[in-house]
């Protein structure tokens, strides 16, 4: 296919403010940029289509650098609790969902967040047992680092007062030693192993739903981690083969491989082509701030009895990174707390990646000046989730204390130190919409407050830097800085077309911009009617 795109504002992202009048695309690759007349004279032919932007604004395709694609699709299919603001509303929604289920199915929901309740108390089995005495119920907290289950689910998993905490996890127990139904991090696996395996059809349906939804948000690709959560690795692999690899639903899928899945993954035939590729080995170093399981150097201010959860001891973390090196892989490590981040840096220093390569540290929410300086000297890149600011403030201030907040969520500082940073959502934990992430990076305001302040305003990013996270950053973090993330000759023809110019509007209106078109490999996959 040959096409000349013109008639709008085309930002190349080669440098701030740089625009071109027209773009010529052939077989999914940009072959020329410049004036419309010059490109028409050089490339115009009966086979060359002319596509007018009708005044719309084109960018290199936005790419989410960290999400869980199949999980995002599940959120479209399952009980979504993320907008509910009380235990009663959650229980009512769960009861309504139960009416749609076969008799023996588990009831599974996604996204509860006690910080949205008037009284921020966790869900427990006592809440759930009142309405669900017999059917197993599993409700995932929004961070996916905690779950609330009822007694039937505990019984199905064989969890009792005598069950010890697994390494890297916590089974919360009451004063009498009885499980409360709340489980954190690796303890969740005890429940998840008892849940009947999902079908191939279910995973296929979830992935397709996710890709289609991402198109509507202007996303042309995503770096996803979901190969270890749906039974055998072959199940999600087949889903990616059916949906994306053959081009049925074009989407640039860069897949991380969880360390628990990597050996099985190696045994399977690898998918290839322009839409599916594999990247680093995924490891979790800690939990999340919402459940106080992110690993901190000092205890939580609002609960001095804990400083979080270390998912792997130092020796195991080092062994896992060494395993990745033996397989010729980099690592992508979830590290939210400062102590987790420090331990990951220590392990990477002992087992560095090959020259010219870098490891990925995901989230990097709570740091200190020493860690930031150290990270800037090391072969690492950071996956940032700007919308965490909108979700976590203001409650996170009481959780961490004001002193730690000075270098928390420090996106601008990290970028200023020359660290390669990319932008993502962590969907389904946060909304997948990149415009919400860009707006959060620019404004740093809470979505829980009307007309609230900008938190740590000195860390607000200019609009250009925020968009770079989702273009140049997402390309560079997977070594594609010379083929994606810019509109220039030789780059992939992946475009996000907006209804308005993000550089010319009030940043508070960024999320109101419409996606006019999403273009992948030169093909229009989504167009607003």
Curated annotation (Swiss-Prot):
One of its GO terms (molecular function) is hydrolase activity, acting on carbon-nitrogen (but not peptide) bonds. InterPro entries: Amidohydro_3, Metal-dep_hydrolase_composite, Metal_Hydrolase, YtcJ-like. Gene3D superfamilies: 3.10.310.70, Metal-dependent hydrolases, Urease, subunit C, domain 1. It is an enzyme of class 3 (hydrolase). Its EC number is 3.5.-.-. Keywords: Hydrolase. Belongs to the metallo-dependent hydrolases superfamily. This is Putative amidohydrolase YtcJ. It comes from Bacillus subtilis (strain 168).
